[in-house]
Amino acid sequence: MNDRADGGEQSRRYGIREGAFQAIMLGGGENYLSAFALLLHASAFQIGLLSALPQLIGTWTQLLSVKALSWVRHRKSIILTGVAGQAFVWLPLLALPLIFPEQGPWLLIACAVAYVAMGHFAIPAWNSLLTDLVDPNRRGAYFGHRARVMTVSSFAALCAAGLILHSAEAWEQPWMGFAVIFLAASAARGVSAAYLARIDESSVPVTREDEFRLLAFLRREHGLNFRRFLLFSGLMHTCVLIAGPYFVVYMLRDLHFSYLEYSLWLAAGVIGQFVTLKPWGRLGDRYGNKKVVAATALLVPFLPMLYVLSANLHFLLAVNFLGGVIWAGLALGLQNYVFDAVRPEDRAKGVAIWNSVNAVGWFVGAMLGSVLAGVLPGEIAFAGLEVRPASNLP
């Protein structure tokens, strides 16, 4: 019994370390995919597609992963397949667009689809395994701590990658900077896979997934609440992603920010998450994740409005810091609500369905944003009054 408890504690530590190296990949690699697309002269439509299509297709692999959970004995085999595949995909993602620059943006989108799909393939099994390892009463604190560690790692990687890109830009060889940060992202995901391989799956009882029947799952106890939650989360992602993918276009192409200034803007959001993740986790444990979600969701609509007011770098840093604070609570609350709202044997299915709904909203919002960016006028005129917002795309 003590051996099992010790194994569980060690596995929880490995889960945090794995998250740290995963965050290095996200902060130092994935955060700069859109910037790489702009280097390849991607259009606004291609930027939107780069953001939305991988998420949409990735959810299909997540549903396949849920089905695979009933076929395999060990959840780690599914997790490691996805994570190792994700580490490998960084290599063609970097090389192919540089070898065939005429088709660079489309090749990048194709590789990004494979990259996200591999990551999504691991998510249901990972959530099922890690939540089994953590006591339900400590789940908010544990995942809050893990998210905090990931935020620090992501911030460090984001800043380091920004400095590397800035140096490469100064030498007029920006592609070399992207080569360095993407290869580092691949290596970090490889280390993440190594820590995942060391998690002792035998230290906790295996939660067997029931057969996946979508309608039956949604009709079960708490089904109505979960359907409302799915509708809310999907619509939230739709609205947010109307503008979300195009901030990089606005910053780098229209405001002519350097890679360093763009990195500072990204870093401000990460700092906002870092300083508030632990308090959000405690608030979720004390008052419930639903209240955390409700409080933060009410503030999200005001964030994009602030970008209309000024194009000053310091102002935009403050806005993104505030965005990091709000999104830290919303993201953590949404994740933990799913864990709490469904039965343990339905957890992987619940996560997969939730991510699928989010991805549909993500795709619809990003595509709608690409259309609006092309058809909306540059200034607003009404009753002889003309207004040109500071954030207008030319």
Question: Where in the sequence are the language-model features?
Answer:
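Structural signature of the two symmetry-related core transmembrane helices
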Residues: S77-L93, S186, K291-L306
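Transmembrane alpha-helix termini and helix-breaking/packing motifs in multi-pass membrane transporters
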Residues: S34-L39, K67-W71, L94-F100, S154-M176, ...
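Helix-loop junctions at membrane interfaces in 12-TM secondary transporters
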Residues: L93-A112, L306-N320
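Intracellular juxtamembrane helix-capping segments at the cytosolic ends
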Residues: L33, H120-V134, G329-R343
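Intracellular loop-helix junctions on the cytosolic face of multi-pass helical membrane proteins
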Residues: M1-Y14, P97-I99, Q103-I109, A117, ...
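Helix-loop boundary and gating motifs at the non-cytosolic
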Residues: M1-W60, S65, L69, K76-Q86, ...
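Loop-to-transmembrane helix entry/capping segments in MFS-fold secondary transporters
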Residues: A44-F45, V134-R146, Y259-L260, V342-V357
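Helix-to-loop junctions at the C-terminal end of transmembrane segments
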Residues: W60-H74, L165, V275-G288, A373
